[in-house]
């Protein structure tokens, strides 16, 4: 087992539903610690840079439009196997296919408005965490 860090974004749809606390509680109950967090409005340029890996995909414009439609809650989670634990808590990308009790099954409306984003691998986690949080703003506890 290894201590990992992962990026979690509570997306505009879940922020608008006022379920930030319920989602964070699930992370903490699963043994993950929030070691950096903030509520912010993404600029279009930031959303395009963050999701640049999807730039050539047909859904890119809709994804960027959605991510700038309201504030997001970005956080760094730390814990044993944090990346996989977070992905298990989130559930399948499509909430209709997400297991009961997962964040997306409980709080997401569609494959587009799917409540949360989480890093998918250690390499992407490192890049995504650094995108939002300089190391000086991250505090292990």
Curated annotation (Swiss-Prot):
Record field: catalytic activity: a 2'-deoxyribonucleoside 5'-diphosphate + ATP = a 2'-deoxyribonucleoside 5'-triphosphate + ADP; a ribonucleoside 5'-diphosphate + ATP = a ribonucleoside 5'-triphosphate + ADP
SUPFAM superfamilies with a match to the protein in the record: Nucleoside diphosphate kinase, NDK
Cofactor(s) it depends on: Mg(2+)
EC number: 2.7.4.6
GO cellular component: cytoplasm
Coiled coil (residue ranges): none
InterPro entries: NDK-like_dom, NDK-like_dom_sf, Nucleoside_diP_kinase, Nucleoside_diP_kinase_AS
List of catalytic residues: 117
Keyword annotations: ATP-binding, Cytoplasm, Kinase, Magnesium, Metal-binding, Nucleotide metabolism, Nucleotide-binding, Phosphoprotein, Transferase
Single GO MF annotation: nucleoside diphosphate kinase activity
Biological processes annotated in GO: CTP biosynthetic process; GTP biosynthetic process; UTP biosynthetic process
Record-listed ATP binding positions: 11, 59, 87, 93, 104, 114
UniProt main location, coarse: cytoplasm
Subcellular location as annotated: Cytoplasm
Source superkingdom: Bacteria
Family: Belongs to the NDK family.
Function: Major role in the synthesis of nucleoside triphosphates other than ATP. The ATP gamma phosphate is transferred to the NDP beta phosphate via a ping-pong mechanism, using a phosphorylated active-site intermediate.
Quaternary state and interactors: Homotetramer.
UniProt name for this protein: Nucleoside diphosphate kinase
UniProt lineage: Bacteria, Pseudomonadati, Pseudomonadota, Betaproteobacteria, Burkholderiales
């Amino acid at each position: 087992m290894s201590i990992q860090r992962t990026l979690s974004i509570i997306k505009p749809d879940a922020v608008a539903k006022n379920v930030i606390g319920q989602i964070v509680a699930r992370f903490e109950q699963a043994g993950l610690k929030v070691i950096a967090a903030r509520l912010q409005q993404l600029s279009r340029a930031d959303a395009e840079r963050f999701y640049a890996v999807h730039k050539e995909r047909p859904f890119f414009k809709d994804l960027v439009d959605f991510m700038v439609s309201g504030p997001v809650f970005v956080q760094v989670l730390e814990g044993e196997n944090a990346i996989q634990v977070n992905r298990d808590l989130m559930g399948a990308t499509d909430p209709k296919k997400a297991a009961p009790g997962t964040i997306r099954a409980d709080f997401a409306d569609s494959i587009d408005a799917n409540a949360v984003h989480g890093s998918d691998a250690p390499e992407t986690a490192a890049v995504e965490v650094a995108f939002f949080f300089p190391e000086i703003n991250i505090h292990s506890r």
